[in-house]
Amino acid sequence: MQNKPSFILRNPSANKGTGFNNEEREKLGLKGLLPPKVESLQEQSDRALSQFTSFNTNLERYIFLNCLRDRNETLFYYLLSNNLELMMPIIYTPTVGEACQKFGNEFRFAQGMYFASQDKGNIRAMMDNWPAEGVDIIVVSDGSRILGLGDLGTNGMGIPVGKLQLYVAGAGFCPTRTLPVIIDSGTNTKKYLEDKYYLGERHPRIPDSEYYPLVDEFLAAAFNKWPKVIVQFEDISNDHCFNLLDEYRNKYLCFNDDIQGTGSVILSGFINAVRSVQKPIKEHRMVFLGAGSAGIGVADCIMSLFDEAGVSKEEARKSFWFVDSKGLITTTRGDELTSQKKQYAREDYTYQLKSLLEVVRDVKPTAIIGLSGIGGSFSQEVIEEMAKHVEKPIVFALSNPTTNAECTAEQAYQWTDGRCIFASGSPFKPVEYKGKTFVPGQGNNMYIFPGLGLAASVCEAKHVTDAMIITAAKTLASFVEDSEVLTGKIYPGLQHIREISTRIAVKVIEKAYEEGMAQLPRPDNIEALVKSRQYVPSYDKSKN
């Protein structure tokens, strides 16, 4: 059955479309089923790019790309790899956010696997239904905190799907050995529970007493089925993500990109921002807006810079101020703090600061870092107040998607009179201000997670350690030259992502061997090993 010509043309991993040559068409029984012309992969890509640019909206472009992937996987990844800067905002932030919100309405075909609360006790058996022979990487979400959009439930599947497409394009994971997963534990979003097109289980989120055993069963089943797989947790709500990472990071090969990946990529940008302002790390005062998984993850990574400067953790924490919905986080505020917030709660405040503006006036920060998910929360008054006291303010407006950014790049440059070092989570176009062109930095996890995941997979790491995360950040930072840093550039161009991911993988593998985390016998040439494992989209299978 699977050798029928119709099956070959409908199998995205095998289909070449008009790329089948005449000999293949004869051998496979495809004569007459395709137009006569035989096209190269580049010719097919040129047409696909023309089709892509012809659509009027980014959501239409997103749907087109995913339909292409479901038709011809090789062509999709060839097109994506050669146009990554153009297409990354489509397959991932910010467009993927809209796609997730409209997942039920725009559903065309199933991708990945879904494990619901009703499947408890059957997850391992269900995994045998996955058609691929092996899996190297899983990205799993429960849909509870999708980007800055909140609880989308099963609609969040677009995030694991898009993330794995970036793993393939950025690092060279083999697409047939990737698995996107949704653990459907319900949703508390009334709109979706009442939406006739919603495809998930229609009940509120299950209690922790059921949730944690469900996740535990999933992980045990995954590592039983694929012992060398790496699992990346994605977009899981703050009330669960820290607990899951703490529970499993030393048991399985796994990491949380929202905590560790975000921390690593922002650490890299901060390293270069510090280089740019030419002020020692010990002299920086950092105000964070948002104390969730990403904010705490970033602060934990930045703490490593203080450690390298010989500053104790207790002393280093005095350089951090966290602001949440209730104001400055202090030990005397009177509310119940999570363990993550407690470690950064200020002990030296007998008075309460209720707003970000009050905190900025009080602290006079050198850096303000937004991971709040609240668009526009860096007001003109806040940024101008900060800029009064700092020659080169560091402004990181990192919330995704673009509509949730704390301020725009244009606002940051205007309100600081072009003096700030700016980075965002989603892309912004270059800004013209007073005759000068500013290119905003994008603190995109895409710089980190492909190379980090590839490293862990290639060397068969036992676990992903803090040292490996920090090594990835430092490697990324090294791609920006001193002369570029002084102009305000803090991240390299994404067009170099395969080179960046390869170098990060090599350096992280070296760190894994240094720490005794790598289980694969050490090769003579780590870089050669990494490159030998990287997928290249081609109809010549000898290249894959």
From Swiss-Prot:
Site positions per UniProt: Important for activity: 258
Q: Which cofactor does it need?
A: Mg(2+); Mn(2+)
Which PROSITE patterns does the record cross-reference, listed alphabetically?
A: MALIC_ENZYMES
Where do the annotations place NADP(+) binding?
Answer: 287-303
SMART domains attached to this UniProt entry = malic, Malic_M
Q: Where in the cell is it found?
A: Cytoplasm
Reaction(s) this enzyme catalyzes, per UniProt: (S)-malate + NADP(+) = pyruvate + CO2 + NADPH; oxaloacetate + H(+) = pyruvate + CO2
Where do the record's region annotations for Disordered lie?
1-22
Which sites bind NAD(+)? 145, 258, 400
Where does this protein have compositionally biased stretches of type Polar residues? 12-21
**Which EC number applies?**
1.1.1.40
Q: In which tissues is it expressed?
A: Expressed in the fruiting body.
Q: Which GO terms describe its molecular function?
A: malate dehydrogenase (decarboxylating) (NAD+) activity; malate dehydrogenase (decarboxylating) (NADP+) activity; malic enzyme activity; metal ion binding; NAD binding; oxaloacetate decarboxylase activity
Q: What induces it?
A: By cAMP and the MADS-box protein srfA.
Where in the sequence is the signal peptide annotated? none
Enumerate the Gene Ontology biological process terms: malate metabolic process; pyruvate metabolic process
- The residues responsible for catalysis, as annotated, are 92, 163
**Residues at which a divalent metal cation binds:** 234-235, 258
One of its Pfam families is: Malic_M
Self-association and partners: Homotetramer.
The entry's family comment says: Belongs to the malic enzymes family.
Instruction: Output the NCBIfam families linked to this UniProt entry.
Output: PRK13529.1 (NF010052)
Q: Which PANTHER family match?
A: MALIC ENZYME-RELATED, NADP-DEPENDENT MALIC ENZYME
The molecule here is called NADP-dependent malic enzyme
Q: Which organism is it from?
A: Dictyostelium discoideum
Gene name for this UniProt entry: malA
